[in-house]
Structures are given as structure tokens and as C-alpha cells.
């Protein structure tokens, strides 16, 4: 019998009406704004009424450094949420929305996989409720208003050479990284160099994911720095009178999306910043809403713990006042073997020696998460090529690092395959949280970057020229010194070289550029060759995506 694909499993799911899913959480039908029969937004009025309720336990799912195909972190997040519900706990899943870029590129969708999926999978991986389109429109409205302001006289005296606000689109398109706009003569404006980022790297995306409510959203939008005058003083979005119109475009997108898993458990899917080039977490408003409605909230942060978990702790939890109770580090035998030097085409063969070498990567992530005061458990996401000897080697290594490891078969078996992990997570979460961020607010910005590089990446030093250091000092003098930092670097390594696997020591982290996200509330350090507009691979997934003769989508994964 052929193994069903993710899309076939999702299509066969017996979904409940979304009002029934909401009712299970105590959300009345009138508080839901339906988008069809199987997804809805939760109204701001209902969310405001939750204030004062006690919070449930917050569980983070993170991972080791991934292989290019991903290691099933979202699948494990969904599976664990289902598993907690299976053992009698009231649990909600909180994950990010999918970007079209990786859907049509290499990584694929963001709805989980196998028997641990959020549905409707096809909608989620494509346009969903239109949030990303609204974010793109709001971002590009500001870009249009900048060029329009300059065209009509430039009363704010913006220096066209120092405009920092680029345009965005939700697609991988390297051809748009660097562009020249306003060509074609004086009727079109004044030519200048700029470029595009992917929507998930937009500061508007980060603002939507970190804002408390609509009032806070508009206030943060107004704080966006769009560029500088010749005297290097900043020009803000509010100076252009753009924040109100942007907030109008984002009004509906600000409301969390409620959907369900294949097992009919509730899931909030809202926001979608990448963790390699942004802060990598779903929205604060969705997480807080879930914490008021459930005893356990299972959320994920993008890529490995060096990126997603660090930003979850140091940016999201710091800014939102959240206290995680436990963390799950997802590992796969194949990724550990790759970290141990095995070529991608050989990952299906047993190689315990390489696996043990690669386990150093797992050990680094376990230690890093523990460094935030959060108890850790390891989930071994099972693949059919795993051997018993390899699985036991991972268990033994994790035990040596003070973390129990559980083999999880949620992809194939759903919640029945992850019960043991769910029980352990409940046990860990019952202890008082000792969570603390990595660095204090009052540490200088460059020292914060050095702290992340040395403590999390085990780098020897951080390389930044005097222009970058001077810029950071200028921002500190302007009152931005207390902001956390967001390190943008490759997800495949603790270094800035994607080819260096394992747990390297003593390397350097070069900072190529720094960007102030004053509205979101952090400073971005772009490290190595990472790009905020990805490109497509030589054989993009888009080549395999099509409609069949009945108009059904094929090829999504």
C-alpha cells in the first residue's frame, strides 16, 4: 500500500465546523469572523474581555540546526498539542503562517506533516486569510508615500541616499534584491537605488507579531524609521502621516486565525516572521489569547534553537512579559548524521559513529536552552530509515547532557505516537519557571551582539567595522540602547558558513550591516552572507505544483 502524502492526508481529514472548535475553547460564535467553514478570525472585543484570566503553561518547541529539508519542528509542535489533548489536558497550538516563498522554493509549507497537521493545509500554505497580503500592502504603502513625498517637494528633507525603507513581496526573487526606482524621466520622480525584501522580513510583520492591540499597532507603525536627513536626524513613518492608513490595512490581519488539527484540536496560526532574517515567532496576541483559553500552549520558533529559541526568549518573551515553562528540542537521526559529516545522499544508511559526532550539535542546543533557565526534553522525530542502534545512541547522548529523549512517531501515528513526550512535558511544566533572558536591557548594543555570538554560537569574536559601531552608538544616544538584538544569519550552522556543521568553537561572526527596527523594538545585525530576500533553488518546488483534472491542488507539501 502506497504511503499517503501530506496533502492526501489533509484532504481526507474530517474537519469540524470552526464554530465547534471555538466553542470548545469558550469562544462564542458571535466572536468569530468566519472565512469559510473551517477557519475564522477571533474578534478583538472578545480578546479584550480575556484580560484578568490566569495564564496556562507556555511550551516552546525548538530544534537542532536543520538540514535543508527541515526536521519536523512544526510537525512535532502539532503532534505535541494533539498528544496533550489526548492525555486529558486542555491544550492549544500556536504556530506561524506559511510564506509563499519557501512553499514554491525548497522548504515547503508550514502546516506540519503526516498525521500531525493543521488543516485546511492547502489554504494555510497559500493565501489563507490574506494576512500576508495585508502586511505587504501596508509596507509598500509606506514605500509609495516616501517616494511621493520626495516627488512633491520633500518638505521633510529626506536624503534620498539614506532612505532605509525598502519594498517587500511574499516570494523568493533574488532579481529584486537591488533595484533602481523612479526611472523614466522627471514625471516619475528622482532615481535612487533601493531593493526588495521578502514580506516575512518586513518590520511591519514584526510589528504585527509584537503589538498588544490595534492602538499599540498604530503607535509602533508611527515609530518606524524610514530614513535620514542630511544632518543624519531620523524621519519617522508618523512624519509622513502614513501610520493611520497602514493600521487600517492591518485591522483584520491583527486578529488571530483559529483553525484545527487533523484530530480536531484548536490551533492559532498567526504571523510568520522567519527566524534566520527576522525574530521567528508567531504573534504575541495569538499566544496571549491561547494562554487565557487553555492550560497548555504549545508554540514553535523557527529553525534551530540558536536562532528561533534565542529570539523567542530574548525578543518575544522579553517584550511581551511571557515566561515559558518548558522547551522541547526536536532532533532527527538524519540531521545528526549530517552534522557528523554524512553526505545528504547517504543519510538513509546506518552510521552510529557519525551520529555520535553529530550529537555535539544537539548537546550545544540543550545547553543553550538550559542557559535561559528553561527545562529541556528531546523529541526524536522518527524517520523510517532510523535504526534501533542510532535511536539508542541519541537517547544515551541526551541523558549524558541531562535531558531525557523520547522517540516520537506522531507523523505516522498522530497523538498516539507522542504520548510519552506529552506526559514528560506536563511533568517539566509543573515546576516553577526560572526563565531569564540572556542579557540585560541596559547592556550596550554591540555587547549584546557579542553576548549572543559567544554564549549561543560559541564564537571567539564579532567583527564589525567602525561604521557599524558608530551607527550603534548613534542609536544608543538617540534612546534605542535598551532594545534587544536580532541576529540574522544562516540557519544551518552556529557559524555564518552554512557548510560548517556540528558544534564549532572559536570562529568569528562578521556583521555586514545593522538595521534599526524602532517600531518593532529591536536592532537587526545582518551576519555573513545572509540575505533578506531569498532566491529560488535550481529546481524549485513550484515545478511540481499543479492542478489535476478535477481542479485539485497537487504537489504542495
Swiss-Prot record:
Q: Which species does this protein come from? A: Cereibacter sphaeroides (strain KD131 / KCTC 12085) (Rhodobacter sphaeroides)
Task: Give the pathway listed in the UniProt entry for this protein.
Answer: One-carbon metabolism; tetrahydrofolate interconversion
Name the enzyme's class: ligase
Name-wise, this protein is Formate--tetrahydrofolate ligase
- What taxonomic classification does the UniProt entry list for its organism? Bacteria, Pseudomonadati, Pseudomonadota, Alphaproteobacteria, Rhodobacterales
The similarity comment for this entry is:
Belongs to the formate--tetrahydrofolate ligase family.
> Keywords of this protein's UniProt record, alphabetized?
ATP-binding, Ligase, Nucleotide-binding, One-carbon metabolism
> Which superkingdom, per the lineage?
Bacteria
Entry's Gene Ontology BP terms: tetrahydrofolate interconversion
The record's NCBIfam families line, in alphabetical order, gives: PRK13505.1
- Binding, ATP: 67-74
Q: Which GO terms describe its molecular function?
A: ATP binding; formate-tetrahydrofolate ligase activity
| Reactions performed catalytically | (6S)-5,6,7,8-tetrahydrofolate + formate + ATP = (6R)-10-formyltetrahydrofolate + ADP + phosphate
* Pfam families in alphabetical order: FTHFS
Q: Known EC number(s)?
A: 6.3.4.3
Amino acid at each position: 500500500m502506497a504511503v499517503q502524502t501530506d496533502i492526501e492526508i489533509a484532504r481526507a481529514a474530517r474537519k469540524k465546523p470552526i464554530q465547534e472548535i471555538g466553542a470548545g475553547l469558550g469562544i462564542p460564535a458571535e466572536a468569530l469572523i468566519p472565512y469559510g467553514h473551517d477557519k475564522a478570525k477571533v474578534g478583538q472585543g472578545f480578546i479584550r474581555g480575556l484580560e484578568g484570566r490566569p495564564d496556562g503553561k507556555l511550551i516552546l518547541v525548538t530544534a537542532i540546526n536543520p538540514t535543508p529539508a527541515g526536521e519536523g519542528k512544526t510537525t512535532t509542535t502539532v503532534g505535541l498539542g494533539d498528544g496533550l489533548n489526548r492525555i486529558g489536558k486542555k491544550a492549544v497550538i500556536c504556530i506561524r503562517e506559511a510564506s509563499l516563498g519557501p512553499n514554491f522554493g525548497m522548504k515547503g509549507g508550514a502546516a506540519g506533516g503526516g498525521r500531525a497537521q493543521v488543516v485546511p493545509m492547502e489554504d494555510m500554505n497559500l493565501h489563507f486569510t490574506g494576512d500576508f497580503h495585508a502586511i505587504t500592502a501596508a509596507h509598500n504603502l509606506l514605500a509609495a508615500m516616501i517616494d511621493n513625498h520626495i516627488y512633491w517637494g520633500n518638505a521633510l528633507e529626506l536624503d534620498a541616499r539614506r532612505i532605509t525603507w525598502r519594498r517587500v513581496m511574499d516570494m523568493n526573487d533574488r532579481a529584486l534584491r537591488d533595484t533602481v526606482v523612479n526611472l523614466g524621466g522627471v514625471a516619475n520622480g528622482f532615481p535612487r537605488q533601493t531593493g526588495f525584501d521578502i514580506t516575512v522580513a518586513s518590520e511591519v510583520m514584526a510589528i504585527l507579531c509584537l503589538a498588544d492591540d490595534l492602538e499599540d499597532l498604530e503607535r509602533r507603525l508611527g515609530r518606524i524609521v524610514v530614513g535620514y536627513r542630511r544632518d543624519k536626524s531620523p524621519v519617522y513613518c508618523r512624519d509622513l502621516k502614513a501610520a493611520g492608513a497602514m493600521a487600517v490595512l492591518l485591522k483584520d490581519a491583527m486578529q488571530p486565525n483559529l483553525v484545527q488539527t487533523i484530530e480536531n484540536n484548536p490551533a492559532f496560526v498567526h504571523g510568520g516572521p522567519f527566524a534566520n532574517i527576522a525574530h521567528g515567532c508567531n504573534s504575541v496576541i495569538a499566544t496571549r489569547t491561547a494562554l487565557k483559553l487553555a492550560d497548555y500552549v504549545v508554540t514553535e520558533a523557527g529553525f534551530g534553537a540558536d536562532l528561533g529559541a534565542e529570539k523567542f526568549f530574548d525578543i518575544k518573551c522579553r517584550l511581551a512579559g511571557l515566561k515559558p515553562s518548558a522547551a522541547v528540542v526536536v532532533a532527527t537521526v538524519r540531521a545528526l548524521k549530517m552534522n557528523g559529516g554524512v553526505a545528504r545522499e547517504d543519510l538513509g544508511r546506518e552510521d552510529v559513529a557519525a551520529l555520535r559526532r553529530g550529537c555535539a550539535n544537539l548537546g550545544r542546543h540543550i545547553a543553550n536552552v538550559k542557559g535561559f533557565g528553561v527545562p529541556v526534553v528531546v523529541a526524536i522525530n522518527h524517520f523510517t530509515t532510523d535504526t534501533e542502534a542510532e535511536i539508542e545512541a541519541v537517547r544515551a547522548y541526551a541523558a549524558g547532557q541531562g535531558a531525557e529523549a523520547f522517540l516520537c512517531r506522531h507523523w505516522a501515528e498522530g497523538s498516539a505516537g507522542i504520548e510519552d513526550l506529552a506526559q514528560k512535558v506536563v511533568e517539566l511544566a509543573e515546576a516553577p519557571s526560572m526563565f531569564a533572558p540572556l542579557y540585560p536591557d541596559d547592556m550596550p548594543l554591540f555587547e549584546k551582539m557579542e553576548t549572543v555570538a559567544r554564549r549561543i554560537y560559541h564564537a571567539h569574536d564579532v567583527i564589525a567595522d567602525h561604521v557599524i559601531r558608530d551607527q550603534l552608538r548613534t542609536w544608543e544616544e538617540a534612546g534605542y540602547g535598551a532594545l534587544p538584538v536580532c541576529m540574522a544569519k544562516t540557519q544551518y550552522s552556529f557559524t555564518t558558513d552554512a557548510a560548517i556543521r556540528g558544534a564549532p568553537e572559536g570562529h568569528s561572526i562578521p556583521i555586514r550591516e545593522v538595521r534599526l527596527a524602532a517600531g518593532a523594538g529591536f536592532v537587526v545585525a545582518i551576519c555573513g552572507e545572509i540575505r533578506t530576500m531569498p532566491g529560488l533553488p535550481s529546481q524549485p518546488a513550484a515545478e511540481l505544483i499543479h492542478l489535476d483534472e478535477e481542479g485539485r491542488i497537487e504537489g504542495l507539501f
